[in-house]
From Swiss-Prot:
Coiled coil start-end: 643-670
Record-listed Phosphoserine modification sites: S168
Protein name in UniProt: Small conductance calcium-activated potassium channel protein 3
Source organism per UniProt: Mus musculus (Mouse)
Composition-biased stretches (Polar residues): 119-133, 241-257
Localisation per UniProt entry: Cell membrane; Cytoplasm, Myofibril, Sarcomere, Z line
Reaction catalysed by this enzyme: K(+)(in) = K(+)(out)
Disulfide bonds listed in the record: none
Length: 732
C-alpha cells in the first residue's frame, strides 16, 4: 500500500483513500512539516455508489472539540518527531477493534446504502468490486469516531493506512492465494475469476472470519511506494516484522499453510509437469542411444586396430578403452535419470504420495538387468586367458591365448535395445494425444510391440530389409572375432567368409563347406538360423500380402467378371434358340429331311444347353464370392440405418397413439359432461315454459274479462293460447 492508500501488489484491487493521510512517504516529510494543518473538510456530497456502503456512527456534537484538540496534538507530534510509518505501530495496534466484527463472516462487513456514508465501495479496474476493510475498522473504532469532523466528512480516514495480516483479512488471503497460482511473489492476477475454483477449495467452507481480540491485536504492516518491495517481503515473511515493531507490542504469530500449497495444485499444473517429464524422458532416451552406439563403434574400432596394427598394451588401446569406459559411465547415468523420470510419471499418473510406491520388485529387477547389460564393456588394460577348442573336420584340439576383451565386447551389442525405446518414444502413435485417447478407450497398451506391429503393417519390406542386413553384418563380425584364434586357414576369420557362412545359415541352406570351430561361433550361427527362419516366414507373408488384391480391386474384378458372364449367358441363350429353330426348320418346314443336318443341329443344341448351364453356375459362384466380400462395417451401417428407420417409425407410431389417447380422453370427458348439459337445457326450457305459461294466463284473463266469451277450459284459458313445446317458439 502506498501513501495514497492504493493496493499495488496485493491483488485485492484499488481502494480510494483521502490524500490527507497523516502518514506521508519519505519524500514528502519536509513538505508536511512546513505546511499548516489543513482545515476541516466540508461535508461530502452524497453519492450513489455501485456497491454496498459502510456507514460509520456519526460523532456526537459534544465530542467535536475534543476531536479537534486530539487532531492538533497529533499534528504537533508529527512535526516534532520524524514522520515514519514504523514508530506508529504501537499506537495503531493499541486501537480497539469493534466487538461486532469478532467471529463474523465476510458478508457481515456490508452495510446498507446511506447518503452520509463516506466509505464508498466502488468496483476496481483490475479485480472488480472489493471491500475496504481498513475504512470499516477505523469507522467502527473509537479513534475513528474521535477524529470525525463536524460535517460528517472523510475525517475518519486520517488514521494511518493499515493492512491486516493474511489470516485476519479474507480479501488479502484471496489475493495471496491467487499469487501462488499465478507464480509471482505478490503479482496481481489479471483474471481473478480464473482461479476462483482453486480459492474455494483452498479456503475451508463455513469457517467464519476470525479477528484478533483487543488484547492480542493483529499485526499491521505499513508500506509506502518506496517500501513496496519490503512490504512484499514482510507479507511472505511475517516473522521478520518483529524486528521493526515497538518493544511493548506483541504480534500474532500465524504462518502460511504449506500443506494446502501442495494439495491445491490444479490439474493444469499437473498436465504441464507431465508433458515436461515426457519431453525430458524422450531426450534422455536419445542421449542414451547416442552414447550406447558411440561405445559400440569405439569398441569395434579398438578390436580391429588391436588385432592388425598394435597390441593391447599400447597407449592407443588404453585411450580407446578409457573412452569406452567414459561413455559407459555417462550411459549408466542417463539410464538412471530415465527411470527416475518414469517413476515421477508413475507418481503423477496414479496420484501417489511417495515415490517408493512405484518401486516394485519387477521394476527393480528390470532396472538392475538394464544396468548390468549396459555396464559390460572392455576394461582398460591387457588381460589374457587360454581358450581351448576342437577343430571341425580334423577334430584335433586347439589351444590359444585370447584376450578377455572378446568376452566383454560381444555383449555390448545388447545395447541396441535402446533403438526400440527411441522408436517408441518418437512414434506418432505414442506422442499424439488423440491416438492415445482412442487406444485407452479400446484398452490398447502402447508399447514397443504395438509400434513394431504398426511398422510391419505400414512398411513391412523396409523393416525386414533393415533388420536382415543389420543382423547379417553383426553376426558376421561376431563370428569373425570368435573364430580368429582357432582358424589357421583363415576361412571363417575372414570377414567375407564369415558373411558367406552367416548368409547360408540365415537362409537355412547349409552347404557344409564352412563350419565354425568354437562354441562362440556355433552359438552365433544357431541364433542366426533361428532368426533366419523367422525372417523367411515373414518374407513369405509379406510377399503373399503384396500379391493379394485389395478390397477395391476385388470389387472391380468381380464387376468385370459379372459383366462377362452376363454376355456369355446371353450368347448361350441365343445359341439355344437358334439351334431350336434350325431343328424345327429341317424337320417340319422342308419337304425333304436331311438327317445329317438335323443331327448336327441337335448336337449344337445340346452344347448350347450345357454351355448355358455352365455359365449360370459360374455366375452363382461369383455371386457367392461377392457376398463374402461384403464388409462388416458396411453391413453394420446398413443395419444401423434399418434400426434407425424402425426407431423413427416407432416414435411416429407412439406419437399417433398419444394423439389418439388424448382425443379419446377428450371424447370421454365430453360424454361425461353430456348429462349435465342435457339437465341444464331441460331446466332452462322448463323455466321458459313456466314463464310463458304465466304470461299467457295473465293475457287471457285480461281479454276474457273484457271481450272474449268464457272458454270451456276449467282454468279459463283456451287450448290454442296455451304454449306447448310443439307450438311455442320459446321451447325450441
Amino acid at each position: 500500500m502506498d501513501t495514497s492508500g492504493h493496493f499495488h501488489d496485493s491483488g485485492v484491487g484499488d481502494l480510494d483513500e483521502d490524500p490527507k493521510c497523516p502518514c506521508p512517504s519519505s519524500g514528502d516529510e519536509q513538505q508536511q512539516q512546513q505546511q499548516p494543518p489543513p482545515p476541516p473538510a466540508p461535508p461530502a456530497v452524497p453519492q450513489q455508489p455501485p456497491g454496498p456502503l459502510l456507514q460509520p456512527q456519526p460523532p456526537q456534537p459534544q465530542q467535536q472539540q475534543s476531536q479537534q484538540q486530539q487532531q492538533q496534538q497529533s499534528q504537533q507530534q508529527q512535526q516534532q518527531a520524524p514522520l515514519h510509518p514504523l514508530p506508529q505501530l504501537a499506537q495503531l495496534q493499541s486501537q480497539l477493534v469493534h466487538p461486532g466484527l469478532l467471529h463474523s463472516s465476510p458478508t457481515a462487513f456490508r452495510a446498507p446504502t446511506s447518503a452520509n456514508s463516506t466509505a464508498i465501495l466502488h468496483p476496481s479496474s483490475r479485480q472488480g468490486s472489493q471491500l475496504n476493510l481498513n475504512d470499516h475498522l477505523l469507522g467502527h473504532s473509537p479513534s475513528s469516531t474521535a477524529t470525525s469532523g463536524p460535517g460528517g466528512g472523510s475525517r475518519h480516514r486520517q488514521a494511518s493506512p493499515l493492512v491486516h495480516r493474511r489470516d485476519s483479512n479474507p480479501f488479502t488471503e484471496i489475493a495471496m492465494s491467487s499469487c501462488k497460482y499465478s507464480g509471482g511473489v505478490m503479482k496481481p492476477l489479471s483474471r481473478l475469476s480464473a482461479s476462483r475454483r482453486n480459492l474455494i477449495e483452498a479456503e475451508p467452507e463455513g469457517q467464519p472470519l476470525q479477528l484478533f481480540s483487543p488484547s492480542n491485536p493483529p499485526e499491521i504492516i505499513i508500506s509506502s511506494r518506496e517500501d513496496n518491495h519490503a512490504h512484499q517481503t514482510l507479507l511472505h515473511h511475517p516473522n521478520a516484522t518483529h524486528n521493526h515493531q515497538h518493544a511493548g507490542t506483541t504480534a500474532g504469530s500465524t504462518t502460511f499453510p504449506k500443506a494446502n500449497k501442495r494439495k491445491n495444485q490444479n490439474i493444469g499444473y499437473k498436465l504441464g509437469h507431465r508433458r515436461a517429464l515426457f519431453e525430458k524422458r524422450k531426450r534422455l532416451s536419445d542421449y542414451a542411444l547416442i552414447f550406447g552406439m558411440f561405445g559400440i563403434v569405439v569398441m569395434v574400432i579398438e578390436t580391429e586396430l588391436s588385432w592388425g596394427l598394435y597390441s593391447k598394451d599400447s597407449m592407443f588401446s588404453l585411450a580407446l578403452k578409457c573412452l569406452i569406459s567414459l561413455s559407459t559411465v555417462i550411459l549408466l547415468g542417463l539410464i538412471i535419470a530415465y527411470h527416475t523420470r518414469e517413476v515421477q510419471l508413475f507418481v503423477i499418473d496414479n496420484g501417489a504420495d511417495d515415490w517408493r510406491i512405484a518401486m516394485t520388485y519387477e521394476r527393480i529387477l528390470y532396472i538392475s538387468l538394464e544396468m548390468l547389460v549396459c555396464a559390460i564393456h572392455p576394461i582398460p588394460g591387457e588381460y589374457k586367458f587360454f581358450w581351448t577348442a576342437r577343430l571341425a573336420f580334423s577334430y584335433t584340439p586347439s589351444r590359444a591365448e585370447a584376450d578377455v576383451d572378446i568376452i566383454l565386447s560381444i555383449p555390448m551389442f545388447l545395447r541396441l535395445y535402446l533403438i526400440a525405446r527411441v522408436m517408441l518414444l518418437h512414434s506418432k502413435l505414442f506422442t499424439d494425444a488423440s491416438s492415445r485417447s482412442i487406444g485407452a478407450l479400446n484398452k490398447i497398451n502402447f508399447n514397443t510391440r504395438f509400434v513394431m506391429k504398426t511398422l510391419m503393417t505400414i512398411c513391412p519390406g523396409t523393416v525386414l530389409l533393415v533388420f536382415s542386413i543389420s543382423l547379417w553384418i553383426i553376426a558376421a563380425w561376431t563370428v569373425r572375432v570368435c573364430e580368429r584364434y582357432h582358424d589357421q586357414q583363415d576361412v571363417t576369420s575372414n570377414f567375407l567368409g564369415a558373411m558367406w557362412l552367416i548368409s547360408i545359415t540365415f537362409l537355412s541352406i547349409g552347404y557344409g563347406d564352412m563350419v565354425p570351430h568354437t562354441y562362440c561361433g556355433k552359438g552365433v550361427c544357431l541364433l542366426t538360423g533361428i532368426m533366419g527362419a523367422g525372417c523367411t516366414a515373414l518374407v513369405v507373408a509379406v510377399v503373399a500380402r503384396k500379391l493379394e488384391l485389395t478390397k477395391a480391386e476385388k470389387h472391380v474384378h468381380n464387376f468385370m467378371m459379372d459383366t462377362q458372364l452376363t454376355k456369355r449367358i446371353k450368347n448361350a441363350a441365343a445359341n439355344v434358340l437358334r439351334e431350336t429353330w434350325l431343328i424345327y426348320k429341317h424337320t417340319k418346314l422342308l419337304k425333304k429331311i436331311d438327317h445329317a443336318k438335323v443331327r448336327k443341329h441337335q448336337r449344337k443344341f445340346l452344347q448350347a444347353i450345357h454351355q448355358l448351364r455352365g455359365v449360370k453356375m459360374e455366375q452363382r459362384k461369383l455371386s457367392d464370392q461377392a457376398n463374402t466380400l461384403v464388409d462388416l462395417s458396411k453391413m453394420q451401417n446398413v443395419m444401423y440405418d434399418l434400426i434407425t428407420e424402425l426407431n423413427d417409425r416407432s416414435e411416429d407410431l407412439e406419437k399417433q397413439i398419444g394423439s389418439l389417447e388424448s382425443k379419446l380422453e377428450h371424447l370421454t370427458a365430453s360424454f361425461n359432461s353430456l348429462p349435465l348439459l342435457i339437465a341444464d337445457t331441460l331446466r332452462q326450457q322448463q323455466q321458459q315454459l313456466l314463464t310463458a305459461f304465466v304470461e299467457a294466463r295473465g293475457i287471457s284473463v285480461a281479454v276474457g274479462t273484457s271481450h272474449a266469451p268464457p272458454s270451456d277450459s276449467p282454468i279459463g284459458i283456451s287450448s290454442t293460447s296455451f304454449p306447448t313445446p310443439y307450438t311455442s317458439s320459446s321451447s325450441c
